[in-house]
Amino acid sequence: MRKIVINGGLPLQGEITISGAKNSVVALIPAIILADDVVTLDCVPDISDVASLVEIMELMGATVKRYDDVLEIDPRGVQNIPMPYGKINSLRASYYFYGSLLGRFGEATVGLPGGCDLGPRPIDLHLKAFEAMGATASYEGDNMKLSAKDTGLHGASIYMDTVSVGATINTMIAAVKANGRTIIENAAREPEIIDVATLLNNMGAHIRGAGTNIIIIDGVERLHGTRHQVIPDRIEAGTYISLAAAVGKGIRINNVLYEHLEGFVAKLEEMGVRMTVSEDSIFVEEQSNLKAINIKTAPYPGFATDLQQPLTPLLLRANGRGTIVDTIYEKRVNHVFELAKMDADISTTNGHILYTGGRDLRGASVKATDLRAGAALVIAGLMAEGKTEITNIEFILRGYSDIIEKLRNLGADIRLVED
């Protein structure tokens, strides 16, 4: 069993460079199946989710080369083999194979998605969209079988009953080679959707409106190869900004797109966090006299659900009381019980998190219950006096590229230990 060991209480300073966006690249890689030539991705994060996707692509027949942060994928040899529950179930984003395999082969058999347990994340919206485009869906045990083999996919007008990033992207992927026009209404607006649309358009797709609540896709017959740079990871950036405000004595966060973080930065400014925003970086000063605030997550451009957990340790430094309400994933509260082991004054009731700041944290043995909870525990461990041991760290390595090295470069006493 591997664990992360932190000796906390040290002031950190220096610079961190943000990697490519996890939530983009996990959709970009399956989307490449639609191309009929080589596609190269730049700024690919070194995370286990990418390694798993590469392994799946190779099992399907793709040729993949990786050097540094560049991923070169030749999808011409991909075969439509069933991808049963197993390797697939470790990935929430495995559902993007539904759209790409349907778009290329007219059918797909894929295990149901896994990832972090944050409460219901039904694929009903995905299936509704595929069915509107002419596919049939059936369950075979833990697998989902989709088919439009006889008639092919056709354009459709699709209204998303709930704003969903995954369903919006998946519908877009499936629609780019469908016959006719597809219109997605009440579409999600996240930057990662624009990133996927940019890749697909550079491959020859006709997508308009990505980043708005109405997306229009006119189907094309073929998609060609291209080269694409993954956008910076706004969630990683927000995580390190929180860390810098919590334990930093001056930390610069590089490769940041401020427009992707405006809602998050606004809440930090409400707390009294002092920072300087530049063209592609944010400098976070040493902080004092922070004020407790209330957080309520919302779809983009609101406060991102993926950032409420990494922000929580910083809130525990603030003076006063506050609440955190996650309207997206109601079960995103498991970090509360682990932070309480570190002597945090924090609790949860009826899905609401209640906290009182100002109490010093103490090192403890804690467990990462999901990706962003793990990030919160790393920040808390760096804040705490004494030693913190974090187990279940595979969740953390799923989404944070080179996290140990990046934190060591700031002066953190942190290491990965093999038991």
Swiss-Prot record:
Gene3D superfamilies noted in UniProt: Enolpyruvate transferase domain
EC class name: transferase
Superkingdom of the organism of origin: Bacteria
Enzyme Commission number: 2.5.1.7
Record: residues binding phosphoenolpyruvate: K22, N23
Keywords: Cell cycle, Cell division, Cell shape, Cell wall biogenesis/degradation, Cytoplasm, Peptidoglycan synthesis, Pyruvate, Transferase
Positions that bind UDP-N-acetyl-alpha-D-glucosamine: R92, R121, P122, I123, D124, L125, D306, I328
Keyword Cell cycle: yes
Gene Ontology molecular functions: UDP-N-acetylglucosamine 1-carboxyvinyltransferase activity
Entry's Gene Ontology cellular component terms: cytoplasm
Reactions that this protein is recorded to catalyse: phosphoenolpyruvate + UDP-N-acetyl-alpha-D-glucosamine = UDP-N-acetyl-3-O-(1-carboxyvinyl)-alpha-D-glucosamine + phosphate
NCBIfam families, A to Z: murA, PRK09369.1, PRK12830.1
Function as written in the Swiss-Prot or TrEMBL entry: Cell wall formation. Adds enolpyruvyl to UDP-N-acetylglucosamine.
UniProt similarity note: Belongs to the EPSP synthase family. MurA subfamily.
Annotated protein name in UniProt: UDP-N-acetylglucosamine 1-carboxyvinyltransferase 2
Organism: Streptococcus pneumoniae (strain ATCC BAA-255 / R6)
